[in-house]
Amino acid sequence: MAKVKMKTNRTAAKRLKITATGKVKYTKGGVSHYNTKKSSKRKRQGRKPQYVPKNLEHKVKALLPNDV
């Protein structure tokens, strides 16, 4: 009988990317609308890519078994 493959979590695949060095990168949410009350600093920091902390990386990588 064939081995059952792990399915990729599509929610995670759409939001996260594994970099060449193995870090997990994502984009910060909450900067697309309702921006008038947010400071320039807060909006600027929202454009920068964010990285998943090292202690949670293994959990996230389990959701992305095929490195989507």
From Swiss-Prot:
Provenance organism: Sulfurihydrogenibium sp. (strain YO3AOP1)
GO cellular component: cytosolic large ribosomal subunit
Lineage: superkingdom: Bacteria
Entry protein name: Large ribosomal subunit protein bL35
Gene3D superfamilies referenced in this protein's UniProt entry, alphabetically: 4.10.410.60
Pfam families, per the entry: Ribosomal_L35p
Keywords: Ribonucleoprotein, Ribosomal protein
Family: Belongs to the bacterial ribosomal protein bL35 family.
One of the GO biological process terms: translation
GO molecular function: structural constituent of ribosome
Residue span of region Disordered: 29-68
Keyword Ion transport: no
Basic residues bias (residue ranges): 35-47
